[in-house]
Amino acid sequence: MSTNHIQPLLDLLYQGKSLSREQAFEIFSALIRGEMSEATMAGMLVALKMRGETIDEISGAADAMRAAAKTFPYSNGDSLGNGIVDIVGTGGDGFNTINISTTAAFVAAAAGAKVAKHGNRSVSSKSGSSDLLAQFGIDLTMSPDTASRCLDALNLCFLFAPHYHGGVKHAGPVRQALKTRTLFNVLGPLINPARPEFMLLGVYSPELVLPIAKVLKALGTKRAMVVHGSGLDEVALHGNTQVAELKDGDIIEYQLTPADLGVPLAQISELEGGEPAQNALITEAILRGRGTDAHANAVAINAGCALYVCGIADSVKTGTLLALSTIQSGKAFELLSQLAKVSSETKE
């Protein structure tokens, strides 16, 4: 295992210097190919973390991951209301909430958005998006062709990250041994193989909101909201949400309150989640229109922002209202049942 070809780049990092986007692409491509020892990988990730990753470094790492990913066979639309949207969080916010973004994906799709949700197993709670979906019998290992058919037929598909990004396995032992956040903690939402034009992306720290919006711009995302909601990696029902919105090539920063979204404030304790089986019951109740007000509102404000970002709603408030009416209709639960059926019809 030789890293001679990237040693000059490693030396730059060890000197506290920044890498260009192209250099970051080269060094992370080597990692993905399994050409880097665990010791070298740990040194690289810690060097980046201690200095603080730049926009170019995050973008280059995402470029490498995207280039190496299994292809998702889908032709994206390129206009508002037509392209693909993802509702995703970095995880790692430390709160054990219900599966808000995953549940919101069903609501947004039932309201007319084309949602390709890129997810993994739990990071910040007892139940990640993939843990939850497995409870409903949704086949996480569905082939890319099957996922594409789901997106065509149902406006929704889930792309299980390890199924598309096999090279990440090389970093697993190092990430576990380091026991600290690294660049990989923000890469997941940036490497959706469907290449969504529109994104609602939650981050675990308010310091990441603007930088990640800049990364999305560098990666060619058309329109996005990057959010941190009073400790959560999603739009908050219990306090203010910090937003960096990417629109028409510009990034504007502002804050949202629950009142701005047309819903009352709730306590974070009202959103506490549990194990996958318990969270599945909560998600089912929400999607059937039988959830608590706090649960329904938390999901609706996130689905509503996604509907705004992808152009179906003209404001976050009207998006939230559309999401709430979709929840009450029960359409989102019908969609869940259909996805479970279609996703399991064809095995790879």
UniProtKB/Swiss-Prot annotation:
Q: Coding gene?
A: trpD
What is the organism of origin for this protein? Shewanella putrefaciens (strain CN-32 / ATCC BAA-453)
Q: What is its EC number?
A: 2.4.2.18
Family classification:
Belongs to the anthranilate phosphoribosyltransferase family.
Gene Ontology biological-process annotations: L-tryptophan biosynthetic process
Q: Which PANTHER family does the entry link to?
A: ANTHRANILATE PHOSPHORIBOSYLTRANSFERASE
* Family matches, as NCBIfam families: trpD (TIGR01245)
Reactions catalysed, as given in the entry: N-(5-phospho-beta-D-ribosyl)anthranilate + diphosphate = 5-phospho-alpha-D-ribose 1-diphosphate + anthranilate
Q: Give the matching SUPFAM superfamilies.
A: Nucleoside phosphorylase/phosphoribosyltransferase catalytic domain, Nucleoside phosphorylase/phosphoribosyltransferase N-terminal domain
Which Gene3D superfamilies does the record associate with it? Nucleoside phosphorylase/phosphoribosyltransferase catalytic domain, Transferase, Pyrimidine Nucleoside Phosphorylase, Chain C
Residues engaged in binding anthranilate 2: R175
Q: How does it assemble?
A: Homodimer.
Q: What is the lineage of its organism?
A: Bacteria, Pseudomonadati, Pseudomonadota, Gammaproteobacteria, Alteromonadales
Give me the residues that bind anthranilate 1, please. Answer: G89, N120
Listed binding positions for 5-phospho-alpha-D-ribose 1-diphosphate are 89, 92-93, 97, 99-102, 117-125, 129
Q: How is the cofactor bound?
A: Binds 2 magnesium ions per monomer.
Q: What does this protein do?
A: Catalyzes the transfer of the phosphoribosyl group of 5-phosphorylribose-1-pyrophosphate (PRPP) to anthranilate to yield N-(5'-phosphoribosyl)-anthranilate (PRA).
Task: Give this protein's Gene Ontology molecular function annotations.
Answer: anthranilate phosphoribosyltransferase activity; magnesium ion binding
UniProt GO cellular component terms? cytosol
Instruction: Name the InterPro entries for this protein.
Output: Anthranilate_Pribosyl_Tfrase, Glycosyl_Trfase_fam3, Glycosyl_Trfase_fam3_N_dom, Glycosyl_Trfase_fam3_N_dom_sf, Nuc_phospho_transferase
Q: In which pathway does it act?
A: Amino-acid biosynthesis; L-tryptophan biosynthesis; L-tryptophan from chorismate: step 2/5
Q: What is the protein's name according to its record?
A: Anthranilate phosphoribosyltransferase
Binding locations of Mg(2+) 1:
S101, E234
Annotated keywords: Amino-acid biosynthesis, Aromatic amino acid biosynthesis, Glycosyltransferase, Magnesium, Metal-binding, Transferase, Tryptophan biosynthesis
